[in-house]
Amino acid sequence: MSESSSLQARPVAAPLSSWQQAVSGQRRFGLIAHRLHRTGSDSALAQWARSSEDLVRQLGLQLVTVGAAFDALLNEELLVDYPGLHRLPNGREGGLMRVVSRIAGGLTPGEALDGVIFLMDPVDPSSTFPEAQALKRQCVTHGKPFVPTLAGALEWVWVEALVAGLAPERLGATAVAELDPADQTLALIAHDARKAQMVDFAGQHFDLLSRFESRVATGTTGGLLNELAWSRGWPAGQPWVTRYQSGPLGGDAQIAELVLDGACQKVIFFEDPHVARQHEADIQLMERAVWSAGARCSCLNSPAMAALWAQGLERIQPS
């Protein structure tokens, strides 16, 4: 079934409530999962759908789903008869390539996607295919969410609901507890052209970021962030972030090891997609570490994505 035919065959979604109408139209996300993450009732895709289905339906979130992930959902009787679930062809038939196009705007305005959930397995050969790399790059270029892990996918639906105006208590105690950063470590990384944006982001959301139990950063970015913190009244001489090496000298790999050890639960990584990067292998190593720890780690890859995340979490009062 193509996306167009699925739209014709399914009933119109119910009207949105007042808090849902705070979103400018129904948000549209691509949905993809590697084989590991879509196979079986305990797969990451199935876990995400079971946990998120009620909110997805309330939000009217449109899920433009590459074929195998679509079929896996129906096999597990998840999102059955949901009018916002649309099927694209399988990956080998161009489904993933179509998602890349639609992140860039698609061929018609109605096809454009607002972001992508792509549950990635770092040892799946297709994770290095050009279309997979292009999808992430286009998301970063256009400031749209690219969500590659189960932890991130669960969190992002909560963020969408909070930004839409849902009262935090209506998320439930489990979601609010998972969103609480008080026992988490945050990594902050920015390429040279994005360092000023990282400092600006940290300044705008300093109180939220200070709620994390601890923060780490690569070398130069960490130095700038500590200077910011001291200017904001953080105790003099006490680092706000723990600095590791700069990216080209191995800082990305050091943070990757923290992620693999379960000692870092969130990475905010402001990438510059427009320049060649000498330490590209190190960057991919760090990203793939996040995917490996996907049940407990999430990553925000652009200033726009991070700003939306912060907007949602700042609606939750610290415990």
What are these regions (language model features)?
Residues 95-135, 249-284:
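Mid-chain, well-packed structural core segment of small domains
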